[in-house]
From Swiss-Prot:
Family of the protein in this entry: Belongs to the succinate dehydrogenase/fumarate reductase iron-sulfur protein family.
Residues annotated as binding a ubiquinone: W189
Oligomeric form and interacting partners: Component of complex II composed of four subunits: a flavoprotein (FP), an iron-sulfur protein (IP), and a cytochrome b composed of a large and a small subunit.
Catalytic activity: a quinone + succinate = fumarate + a quinol
Sorted UniProt keywords: 2Fe-2S, 3Fe-4S, 4Fe-4S, Electron transport, Iron, Iron-sulfur, Membrane, Metal-binding, Mitochondrion, Mitochondrion inner membrane, Oxidoreductase, Transit peptide, Transport, Tricarboxylic acid cycle
Chief location category: mitochondrion
Organism: Eremothecium gossypii (strain ATCC 10895 / CBS 109.51 / FGSC 9923 / NRRL Y-1056) (Yeast)
Residues that hold [3Fe-4S] cluster according to the record: C184, C231, C237
4Fe-4S ferredoxin-type domain span: 164-194
Protein name, entry field: Succinate dehydrogenase [ubiquinone] iron-sulfur subunit, mitochondrial
Every 2Fe-2S ferredoxin-type domain range: 31-122
Amino acid sequence: MVFRAGIGRIGLIRGLATQAAEVSATRYKSFKIYRWNPDTPAEKPRMQEYKVDLNKCGPMVLDALIKIKNEQDPTLTFRRSCREGICGSCAMNIGGRNTLACLCKIDQAENKDVKIYPLPHMYVVKDLVPDLTNFYKQYKSIQPYLQKASKPADGREHLQSIADRKKLDGLYECILCACCSTACPSYWWNNEQYLGPAVLMQAYRWMVDSRDGAGAGRREQLQNAMSVYRCHTIMNCTRTCPKGLNPGKAIAEIKKALAFA
């Protein structure tokens, strides 16, 4: 029995040594990244390849981008801030899907390239940085703040029941990363007039807030052919949302509110 136990320990040690050797070996992964520099407008956009050792890199795509920028190419440009899916800064198209680089895990298969582009159908500032000027202008247009004609008689904050507060769940969590809007074909075709899934979900968030007193005006603002009705329920918005929200459902609720107002 002692002999067998000894053999077991030797086997365990050999197994651990083998695992350590495997971990210490380099595992290079190819990242092909969209590059464009406005300072050299004559040069066309291109895909540039970088190799990253996965054994010396964090698990997320943003970790790889930061490693590339710090160690290989300081000219690589992208947005990032919180690194935990809260700010929405690092939204980009990874492997054909709009998502947040800080929440997107690196595929560990070394034979599969990771292709990274800026959010689609947006003007590009540089490399992976989209121009969100129009997106934020549209967000501003819905007046995303509490509007009340009068203050509470007792001077306190506007109270809200638990049931009314629950109506905001699945709406207020939006981080305005623009993943959903830039995945929407209707927004690609009409982004100057169609507000897009992200902005419309926020419009609905204020429409159903029991503390707000501008519901009629908010509905009237959306009562036209372009603001809401360009949504054709393709539902790319819901599929791509990195926060697991459902902009498509919010837009459907707006249409119902306008139809039965």
